[in-house]
A protein has these predicted regions:
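Active-site and adjacent substrate-binding regions of carbohydrate-active enzymes
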Residues: 1-169
């Protein structure tokens, strides 16, 4: 819900929604298009069995299914922020005071950093994964492995942001 709220407040996204769907309403927005809450099929669209059926139809049309994976960040209200906060870049109250656009208090009170590209402002609907965390890498690998079971290929969006030298910035 937090990422959805941020998406609904974003004027650029609201304009894009209106251009694509002139009669859209806030209820049509499932979440932020930039912030992954879960790598599961949205229940509004079906379930994993429906995804398999869709993939079979795509194959019958002579094409393959490519799914997206984002190793750099997740939705700011992703369940891991509560169950595995050590998988994210953390801060403290002083960090929020110094850089309020970079840090936020997550559910449960942990202070976490928003996702970002080091050359641009933080994305305020996301949380930054700590790619140096062994637990984060293991959890991401499991998500990627599971996604790959349903796809003919996986596109890794923002993959350059998890390179050691880029991430260190």
């Amino acid at each position: 819900e937090a990422s959805k709220s941020r998406a609904l407040m974003n004027e650029g996204l609201r304009k894009a929604y209106t251009e694509a769907l002139p009669d859209w309403s806030p209820e049509d927005v499932a979440g932020s298009p930039y912030a992954v809450y879960s790598y599961r099929v949205d229940p509004h669209l079906g379930d994993e069995e429906d995804l398999v059926q869709a993939r079979n139809m795509i194959h019958e049309a002579g094409m393959g299914l490519i799914l997206d994976f984002v190793p750099n960040h997740l939705a700011m209200d992703h369940p891991w922020t509560v169950s595995m906060p050590e998988c994210f870049i953390r801060g403290d109250r002083e960090a929020i005071r110094r850089e309020p656009s970079l840090f936020f208090p997550a559910e449960g009170g942990t202070i976490l950093a928003h996702g970002r590209d080091p050359y641009f402002p933080p994305w305020n609907d996301t949380v930054q994964i700590n790619i140096f965390s062994d637990r984060a890498r293991a959890a991401l690998f499991e998500e990627l492995r599971r996604i790959a079971e349903y796809a003919d290929g996986v596109r890794c969006d923002m993959a350059m942001l998890v390179l050691n030298d880029t991430f260190a910035r």
